[in-house]
Amino acid sequence: MKLAIDAMGGDHAPKAIVEGVKRFVAQYPNESMELFLVGDEVKIASYGLDDPRVTVVPASEIITGEDEPVRAVRRKKDSSLVVAAQLVKEGKADALVSAGNTGALMAASLFIIGRIPGIERPALSPTFPTYTGSGVVVLDVGANPDAKAEHLVDYAIMGSLYAEHVRGIKTPRVALLNIGTEAGKGNALTKEAFPLLEQAPVHFVGNVEAREAMSGDVDVIVTEGFAGNILLKGVEGSSSMLMKMMKEQFTSDLVSKLAALILKPKLRRLKETLDYREHGGAGLFGINAPVIKAHGSSDALAIMSALKQAKIMVDHDVVEKIKRAKAID
């Protein structure tokens, strides 16, 4: 297994990226793998990474959050992101991981690595925490604000295969995000997509409302990127608000502090459940190789989780399974 890693992408790069790589390789001390850290050699070396399985690939440019994505990918040929994507295109790496500019990662993936034949619109897909602890794969959350009904079918197939082979769910339950659970609910897109999803080679269980998205009753939720991104931001905001409110209440007086001390193990588990860092990054599905978008504010734990996610996708040959499913379709 070989991973190309954009060492300069993200708010805390390259330190968080290098520290995440350290944690990742430490988890697999005896496993054969090759990791390519792409970026500023001097800065990367300053964090003391010493593992024969890690190679630093020099890149003199950085694509920042202020750069226009497509223009940056075309003009900054020696940027860490573009060089990493080229490694995947040339077959020197099996997957790409980056915490950098989302739009630039999408552009590099499309223009350099390329789309899977038959997939018109790739989808960005994180895993949300659920009440049951199993997680739910949601796609699309922003790669494409608009979509056709046929695209949602592609999302369902890709999400189902990912949930099965990466999340370990035997028969993933696929649902369509909607404003009601009845089959006739929704706008023109959801009404057109519903019967197509019923005929798709997935275990489609109908519509799901946003309030039930994290119940654990479904394993995959499909939607267009506009609604998906609103759902994502709502979940992130609600989780953040909940943790802040709990912290405020449990530190308000001595009795509350004692209660927090007693409940500390359970509170820690709750925090881990809601912590995006534990769930890896968002997979960009529909690309010719696994591409993982780590959160821009990723720390070492989040990077390690994203690398694990990429490893599982490579180990289980998820992209090839998607290609075969589309060929049959």
Curated annotation (Swiss-Prot):
It is an enzyme of class 2 (transferase). It comes from the Bacteria. It catalyses: a fatty acyl-[ACP] + phosphate = an acyl phosphate + holo-[ACP]. One of its GO terms (cellular component) is cytoplasm. Pfam families: FA_synthesis. One of its GO terms (molecular function) is phosphate:acyl-[acyl carrier protein] acyltransferase activity. It is found in: Cytoplasm. HAMAP family: PlsX (MF_00019). This is Phosphate acyltransferase. The lineage of its organism: Bacteria, Bacillati, Bacillota, Bacilli, Bacillales. The gene is plsX.
